[in-house]
From Swiss-Prot:
InterPro entries cross-referenced by the UniProt entry: GAF-like_dom_sf, HrcA, HrcA_C, WH-like_DNA-bd_sf, WH_DNA-bd_sf, WHTH_HrcA_DNA-bd, WHTH_transcript_rep_HrcA_IDD
GO molecular function terms listed in the Swiss-Prot or TrEMBL record: DNA binding
Membrane-crossing residue ranges in chain numbering: none
The keyword Transcription appears for this protein: yes
One BP annotation, GO: negative regulation of DNA-templated transcription
Protein name listed in UniProt: Heat-inducible transcription repressor HrcA
Organism this protein belongs to: Thermotoga neapolitana (strain ATCC 49049 / DSM 4359 / NBRC 107923 / NS-E)
Similarity field: Belongs to the HrcA family.
Pfam families: HrcA, HrcA_DNA-bdg
Keywords: Repressor, Stress response, Transcription, Transcription regulation
Function: Negative regulator of class I heat shock genes (grpE-dnaK-dnaJ and groELS operons). Prevents heat-shock induction of these operons.
Gene3D superfamilies, alphabetized: 3.30.450.40, Heat-inducible transcription repressor hrca homolog, domain 3 (3.30.390.60), Winged helix-like DNA-binding domain superfamily/Winged helix DNA-binding domain (1.10.10.10)
Length: 339
């Protein structure tokens, strides 16, 4: 906590010119991936001061930990602290400009009964526009409301047991039957008991009539089928990034196997969380930046989204694209739940 306070104090110690110099250095380095000299700052900005003044500003920025000099006579390179400054300044600027004009109609063309397609579409859109690796968490079927239960006899010995939940997500399994019962009446009674209840309510015994019954055990077996928790898209973008090594990418793949690591990246509020380099908390991931956030059904979070890129990335673009995708997913699942 102390370090955060010092960082804010350091930023207050920068005058407007020094903030412009720092912003220019980071932006130029992100675009060209080459150390930035004082002369280059003057060439690409509207700062009307001498090269000597800019060099003095750069010395102060280096002293405060925003930039560093990789070797003598080289230009300057932003540190994680410098990248964080750039991201926060960019967010302030983006609030004063128009929102990014993205493929707004794309989500409207997907049927409301096909959430898997929507998640894949969102992942592909984010990975392509942000040039990063995307993980999208699927909604947990146990948290969804049951819309309908169906028992469909298909032969003398088998029937199909189907549970349809919100967003068109269904679980289907064939079951062997040993006696001829009135399956239509059983289906009607099950729908009376289960419709509008969450799967979690049923499995935790909140529907008293079903406690200890064969139907409850059947629902448990259907809902506990293995489902990959995350959709992943855009891995090839990391391989194409010349600021990342294969070793860096290998370390990332090892870390994301642990779902607790992914959960640790998200803040406690609705805001997007951005962690840059050392802020991620793993020495092996210091070359990365990660954008993390949740998407919602109404006011309830139902899944998370993570975007991994090199920390030398287009923060302005990625911030807007990431927020756009989160907002569209929340709109989609909120609308689907109201049908």
């Amino acid at each position: 906590m102390r370090r955060l306070s010092n960082k804010g104090e350091h930023q207050r110690n920068l005058n407007d010119r020094q903030r412009k110099v720092l912003y220019c250095i980071v932006k130029e380095y992100i675009e060209n991936k080459k150390p930035v000299s004082s002369q280059r700052v003057l060439e690409v900005s509207n700062i009307n001061f001498s090269s000597a003044t800019i060099r003095n500003d750069m010395k102060k920025l280096e002293y405060l930990g925003y930039i560093y000099q990789p070797h003598t006579s080289a230009g300057r390179v932003p540190t994680d602290k410098g990248l964080r400054f750039y991201y926060e300044e960019m967010v302030k600027l983006s609030k004063e400009t128009e929102e990014l004009n993205l493929e707004v109609d794309t989500f409207r063309s997907i049927p409301l009964a096909d959430p898997e397609k929507v998640l894949l579409l969102a992942g592909n859109l984010l990975a392509r526009l942000a040039e990063g690796y995307v993980l999208i968490e699927r909604p947990n079927p146990r948290d969804l409301k049951i819309l309908r239960v169906m028992l469909i006899p298909v032969s003398e010995d088998y029937l199909i047991f189907s549970i349809l939940t919100e967003f068109g997500i269904s679980k289907i399994t064939p079951i062997r039957i040993h006696e001829d019962l009135n399956w239509e009446e059983i289906e009607r009674q099950l729908n009376f008991l289960l419709r509008g209840r969450t799967v979690e309510d049923v499995l935790t015994g909140k529907v008293e009539t079903l406690r200890g019954s064969g139907i409850l055990k059947l629902i448990e077996s259907v809902m506990n089928e293995k489902l990959e928790r995350y959709i992943d898209v855009g891995f090839e973008n990391l391989l194409k990034d010349d600021t990342l090594s294969l070793e860096d990418i290998k370390h990332l793949l090892e870390e994301i196997k642990d779902h607790r690591f992914l959960e640790s990246l998200i803040g406690n509020d609705k805001d997007v969380t951005v962690k840059i380099g050392k802020e991620i908390g793993s020495k092996k991931l210091e070359r990365f930046a990660v954008f993390s956030g949740r998407y919602y059904k109404g006011s309830s979070p139902i899944g998370s989204v993570h975007l991994f890129t090199s920390k030398i990335t287009r923060y302005d673009r990625n911030h807007r694209v990431f927020n756009y995708v989160l907002n569209r997913l929340s709109e989609y699942f909120t609308s689907a739940a109201r049908r």
